[in-house]
Amino acid sequence: MQFHERFDVIVVGGGHAGTEAALAAARMGCKTLLLTHNVDTLGQMSCNPAIGGIGKGHLVKEIDALGGAMAIATDFSGIQFRTLNSSKGPAVRATRAQADRALYKAKILNILQHQPNLRIFQQAVDDLVVENGRVIGAVTQMGLAFEAPAVVLTAGTFLGGKIHIGLENYSGGRAGDQPAIALAHRLRDLPLRVGRLKTGTPPRIDARTIDFSVMTEQKGDTPLPVMSFIGDLSQHPEQISCYITHTNEQTHDIIRGGLDRSPMYSGVIEGIGPRYCPSIEDKIHRFADKNSHQIFIEPEGLTTTEIYPNGISTSLPFDVQIQLVRSIRGMEQAEIVRPGYAIEYDYFDPRDLKNSLETKVIDGLFFAGQINGTTGYEEAGAQGLLAGLNAALQVQGKEAWAPRRDQAYLGVLVDDLSTLGTKEPYRMFTSRAEYRLLLREDNADLRLTEKGRELGLVDDFRWQKFSEKRESIELEQQRLRGQWVHVNSPQVAELNEVLSAPLTREASLEDLLRRPEIEYDTLMKVDGFGPGLADPLAAEQVQIQVKYAGYIQRQQDEIAKAERNENTRLPLDLDYSEVPGLSNEVTAKLNAHKPETIGQASRISGVTPAAVSILLVHLKKRGLLRKSA
């Protein structure tokens, strides 16, 4: 049966990738359909109730700078906010928020339901319609066919999902949800490389059975940060504490005693789990010399008694889970509300994707989220936004867009995936970026909002706030450069009290701010120098740009040097065995990866600078030298 309307973009799946994809396509004016197996689980936080963190917070800010929903929903649902690495430089500072699951999901649903051009329909998708190498629609489990020239697939852990608790297992997309078995079989018929990955979640504990008095209280930051560039402290709900406790030798003995019934250590699970979010079984095995591991006791919300014990993700049998939980200080009487489990699922090799997240073999078909081998809400949301905007661009007959590695962590993410692929769940860290000083949380809007406006992603309200902020920064920088202090100025005595060395020659306010011992706020308190900027985010931007100007310029020079051949296009149909001079190893790797640009080719392991030179000569001889936009 054919649905009576035709759409521009269909998004399959309503998790963090799917919601951002659907919102992006709709914001760009495309008639968009979001297909979900259950409207009540749109935007659901399936694992930990938190958004942000090192590397991840940077992605959230970038989603926000491009008009996405994740940061806004976090401000409305965050019950504890912290700035991680606050004592370190601005490049690695990151915002993290503990979120109320119910409030977060409710805000996402509210945003979806009020988005023009977006239709939501509840039905699981069983099939894709592909004709002549191009996707033209999707078919639901009741045989209802929807037509669209672009489809974004964001199936999360649902493709062939199998849940494991001890040696027992059953099919499931996550606890309480059916898997997408028919769709998984359909995708395996396509000429795409497929693998299996695994992730897991800890048991949920009833807070009424926990003794918090013997744990270490962890409060949020004061003053509170906000997640969105258009966020406001008044949006935050009540703020509460988290707590910290630890495993012990008894805990570890219990876990070791249960490993013979662990699906991971008995060969039942074949999928590879996340390296940077290991199960407690993995921790005990890999770090056998440690007699204790930290556990963060995180509330799941303001109106629930469920607690998320971050750090004891497990798929051990339920009886072992009870023992290990009750061996932990403060949880001796704990009751488990939901058992922990592991889930195995299909993912598709992201090397089969373009940087736009469109598949290289099926035109109009885009993948985003865990289907690409990533882990985390933030990584999924960022990919969803990129896939959604590129699906819209394709429908509109426009050229695809993806940020470069020097423009955004999103650029690092998609370049890593499409160039190198992954054999384990991929998590974003600041260490993955070469140009961290340029890719800070605080300047995500300055890096991306103008591009978002050009693409049609950024609404008038956000654009006005951004424009006002950008203008105020520029005007303040001009003022600091133009206002001078002479040695005999009346402010010098006051200044010398905070300077490490007395002022001996005239200096501009910018020169003074460049000194490591001077903060912007301190400078503005000197008589005649203020009042300065009222917006603390704009003031922070002025300070960072002045103090790090030399380092920033150095990184920009490095980028300009690297860009000479970075964006030189490589034909996707190029047979590298026909390029004379390449070694067999390089030929095999290039034919397997099919890089889109010289820059991507150069980052493939084993592709030498000499091989890159050979490629450039070959392209020049064939008249194929051209740059991407």
UniProtKB/Swiss-Prot annotation:
Gene Ontology CC annotations of this record: cytosol
Name of this chain's protein: tRNA uridine 5-carboxymethylaminomethyl modification enzyme MnmG
Organism: Shewanella amazonensis (strain ATCC BAA-1098 / SB2B)
UniProt keyword Flavoprotein, yes or no: yes
Record gene name: mnmG
Assembly notes: Homodimer. Heterotetramer of two MnmE and two MnmG subunits.
Cofactor: FAD
SMART domains: GIDA_assoc_3
Protein's cellular compartments: Cytoplasm
Residues the record lists as binding NAD(+): 273-287
Short name of one Pfam family: GIDA
Residues annotated to bind FAD: G13, G14, G15, H16, A17, G18
Single annotated GO MF: flavin adenine dinucleotide binding
